[in-house]
């Protein structure tokens, strides 16, 4: 894409606010490399205008779009079709046009699991710990279940919200795989875990010195354990710095951001894309 014409196909992201989104940077970088006549645009859409926006997108021929806060749950009843993955997560982040209307899925799941698959572990034997019980934790639970994990521990600080999180899976096939635990239990659990995932915002810019766990926690984990932080700014976080200092394998939130975006672009374009190009564009935007 170099010049926008009457034939240029529209992609984008809806949110409120959406001005801070990094998706246009990485998506347009790969669109340019591929030489396809598309452009990816941020669309600020207030919650009360969501249905109107979808009608407008259909009218002007938008081919597909990402949905971010606060639309990832609210958009579901407005879609003609939703994938099983998105239903399990309870949120949609990627939407595309079909013959019967809009179809939605959640590429956060594939974004999360792709870096883990590259490690070639026996996931059936791994007992992961998830820090936090918000929306991001739901995608992580679904991803871990897809990998084959059958004993998924979710740790949170608010007892009521933890209970609600657990209850929200009661009608799901994953219900038996999930246990919830208070933060006080964490220290006694980590010696049996080979994967710890931070889904909380603790350590996010500008509070870069913070970590959701004490630095001495890492010495209790097995030597082959993996630390995964969904935060991508800073890169690495204090959480990952402490884990790496202990010699553990670390995965940055930038990987998840890139792979979920690449998965969405492949759905829209129906062709393979380069996650490397998207990653480099993001790093340049964030850190140069």
From Swiss-Prot:
Pathway: Metabolic intermediate biosynthesis; chorismate biosynthesis; chorismate from D-erythrose 4-phosphate and phosphoenolpyruvate: step 4/7. GO terms for biological process: amino acid biosynthetic process; aromatic amino acid family biosynthetic process; chorismate biosynthetic process; shikimate metabolic process. This is Shikimate dehydrogenase (NADP(+)). The active site is at residue 72. GO terms for cellular component: cytosol. It is an enzyme of class 1 (oxidoreductase). One of its GO terms (molecular function) is shikimate 3-dehydrogenase (NADP+) activity. Coiled coil: none annotated. Shikimate binds at residues 21-23, 68, 93, 108, 232. Involved in the biosynthesis of the chorismate, which leads to the biosynthesis of aromatic amino acids. Catalyzes the reversible NADPH linked reduction of 3-dehydroshikimate (DHSA) to yield shikimate (SA). It comes from Crocosphaera subtropica (strain ATCC 51142 / BH68).
